[in-house]
Structure formats: C-alpha cells, structure tokens
C-alpha cells in the first residue's frame, strides 16, 4: 500500500513522466554505446532528480511571488533562476568571512541586489548602472523608461540604503575612479562583446585574492 500511495503521488506531481522520458532517452544511448548499468538504481536516481527539480521549481516560484509582493518589481525576471546556484556557491565561498565587498555591474530593478541584501547580511554592496536607454533592454522591454526603472530600484533598495552605494554611471567611468577591491563582482551590464571584455578585464584588476567574478552573458 505504501508503494502504491507513493507511486500515485509521484505520478500526480509529474515526476514519473519526467523520469520515464529521460530513462527512454538515455536507454537508447546506452544501447548504442553498450554501457551496462543497474537499471533499478538508475530509475531511482532519475526519480530523485525529478523530485529535486520539482522542489526547486516550487521554491523558486515561492521566492518570486514573495519578491513580487514585497517589492516594486515588474514581471521581467532574469535573476530568480540563478538563486539556488548563487546561494550554494556564496555560502560556501564566504562562510568564514565577516565582511564581503560586492560589486554589481548592471542592476536594473534590483532583484539580485535585494536578494543579496535579504540573504547575506555581511555584504557591502556597490552597484553601477547608467540607467540609459539602451537597445538590448528595449528589445525585451518595449518602450522601457529607464528613469522609471531607476526610481523603482531606489524604492526597492531604500531599506538597505546603509549597505548600498549607488553609482549612476557606466562601468568604464566607474573603474577609472575606483580604488576599492572586491570579494565578489557580478557582471551583468552591457552584453556587447567588447563591453563585456572590458568589464571582465577591469574586474580582474579589482578582485581580491580568492574572490569570485560572475558573468551573466
């Protein structure tokens, strides 16, 4: 009875369907490659991976709903899918560090900034964004008014203003004047090749030993 109940539950939430689809796909590959595996263990592994994926999806949706209700965000969300990997890596990387200097290039409404503020209390944050009208955002956000976006960011980050330094300028101009080094740098500004290359080059010069640079490109 226990097995039947669990089977029905897994079937209801769509886990078995996903695992079955993966099993068929990989089984075809194994036939061609002639690799032998324990099929029962493999099926259990696939079921577990599907359960984890479902839980993660539910977690992300709850997180997204929470931020949508609490802050002034639009439906445009490039950051939330990155939350699990960010949380895992950052908690491990900075577990014994009391103060983290974090630089964010490209902030938009502040989803990543707010997530860091709420979940990593020892982070001091420097954000850089000119909030100009630029094509790569407007291709996704039609008629986007960057002044309005900037106002939303200021409202969203108001309660954390003691931890956030806002630099409304280009990353190029920021790095010309900057003298501080950072433990974590997130590059999510211009997505044009030469701009990204320049941001990465500058970031390497201003990253602390054992620091982390994240690129969203």
Predicted regions and their residues:
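Membrane-proximal basic amphipathic "stem/tether" segments
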Residues: 1-74
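S-adenosylmethionine/decaboxylated-SAM
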Residues: 63-77, 83, 87-217
